[in-house]
Regions:
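Short, surface-exposed "cap/lid" segments of acyl-processing enzymes
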Residues: 1-41
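Catalytic active-site module of serine/aspartate enzymes centered on a nucleophile-bearing elbow/loop
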Residues: 4, 214-264
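Short alpha-helix in the alpha/beta-hydrolase fold that links the catalytic acid
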Residues: 22, 196-210, 236
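Active-site nucleophile loop of the alpha/beta-hydrolase fold
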Residues: 37, 99-109
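Conserved acidic catalytic loop of the alpha/beta-hydrolase fold
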Residues: 52-70, 83
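Gly/Ala-rich beta-loop-alpha elbow adjacent to hydrolase catalytic centers
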Residues: 73-83
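Acidic catalytic loop of the alpha/beta-hydrolase fold
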Residues: 106, 190-195, 228-230
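Short beta-strand/loop motif that positions the catalytic acidic residue
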Residues: 179-180, 185-188, 192
Length: 264
C-alpha cells in the first residue's frame, strides 16, 4: 500500500520559510499539501480563516487527489486547524495520524497561552524576538486579539479517537482493542514560554495511563529541551521530527514504546 500523504500547517511567523529544513526532509514518495495562513505570516490580511472553509478546503484537496485520509503535521498555532478537523464530522475522517509540534491547543481553558504571547513583557532573547517581530506585528496582533476563539481551538486527548484509523466518537467509552499502535505524536518544548508545558505534559501523561488501562495506545509524547519553536532550528531535532512523520506515513505502522521521553 502507498504511504499516507502529508498535510502541513505552519504557525505564526513568516510562513513556510523557517520550516523549509523540515519540509525538505518529508518523505519524497508521497504527496505533501501545504496550508498557508496569511493572517499570521506578516501579510496584510484583516481576518482569519473560517473554520468551515478551512475544513472544506482540506477535505476537498485530499478528495481531488484521491486520498481518503492523511497525516496532519502542524506547529504552534497551526495545530488549531487540526483541532477543527477532528471536531468536524467530515474532517475527522480525513485525519489518519498527527504530529503536533509545540501545540497550543491543549488546556486552552488556561488563559496563560493567549496572555503570555500577546500581553506579557519579554524576559529573554527569544521572548524579545517573538514580542517585537511576531506578537506585536499589526495583522498578527489583530488575528490573535480578535480572531482567536479558545473554545473552538481547544483539543482534548480524546479527540485523537476521532482519527479515521481508530474510528470512535470521543463521547464513546469503547476504545477499540485491535488498534494497539501509536497514531499520534505530540512534541513539547520543556522551556516553552507560551505553552504551559508542565500542566500539558501531566495532562497527557494521565490520559496515556487512562487509555492504556482501557487497552489502547494511540499517542506518544516527546520532550525537546528548548523554547517554543527552537526545535525547528536544531538539525538533530528536525531529523527526529522528520522520522516521526515518516513513521506516521506508513500504511501499517509498527508498535512503538509509548512514554514521555526527555531528550536533549
Amino acid at each position: 500500500p502507498a504511504k499516507l500523504p502529508i498535510v502541513f500547517i505552519h504557525g505564526i511567523g513568516i510562513g513556510f520559510a523557517h520550516y523549509l529544513g523540515l519540509i525538505a526532509n518529508f518523505p519524497k514518495d508521497t504527496d505533501v499539501f501545504l496550508l498557508e495562513w496569511p493572517h499570521v505570516c506578516m501579510q496584510m490580511v484583516k481576518e482569519g480563516p473560517k473554520i468551515k472553509d478551512t475544513v472544506d478546503i482540506l477535505c476537498d484537496a485530499l478528495d481531488d487527489f484521491g486520498h481518503p485520509s492523511a497525516v496532519f503535521v502542524a506547529h504552534s498555532l497551526g495545530t488549531t486547524a487540526v483541532s477543527w478537523m477532528l471536531h468536524d464530522p467530515r474532517g475527522c475522517t480525513k485525519v489518519a495520524r498527527t504530529v503536533l509540534l509545540d501545540p497550543v491547543t491543549f488546556l486552552l481553558c488556561d488563559p496563560r497561552v493567549a496572555t503570555v504571547f500577546v500581553y506579557n513583557n519579554p524576559t529573554n532573547t527569544v521572548d524579545f524576538l517573538m514580542h517585537f517581530f511576531l506578537s506585536r506585528e499589526l495583522f498578527i496582533s489583530n488575528a490573535l486579539s480578535r480572531h482567536f476563539n479558545w473554545s473552538h481551538n481547544i483539543m482534548f486527548a480524546e479527540d485523537f479517537l476521532h482519527a479515521s484509523n481508530i474510528g470512535s466518537s470521543h463521547d464513546s467509552d469503547e476504545y477499540p482493542l485491535d488498534n494497539d499502535f501509536i497514531s499520534h505524536t505530540v512534541i513539547l518544548s520543556s522551556l516553552d514560554s507560551i505553552v504551559p508545558v508542565g500542566p500539558v505534559s501531566r495532562y497527557l501523561e494521565a490520559k496515556q495511563d487512562e487509555f492504556r488501562a482501557r487497552g489502547h495506545n494511540c499517542f506518544e509524547v516527546c520532550m525537546f529541551h528548548g523554547n517554543h519553536g527552537e526545535m525547528l532550528v536544531h538539525p538533530s531535532w528536525v531529523n527526529t521530527i522528520a522520522r516521526k512523520v515518516e513513521e506516521r506515513c506508513q500504511p501499517r505502522p509498527e508498535q512503538y514504546d509509548v512514554g514521555l521521553n526527555y531528550d536533549d
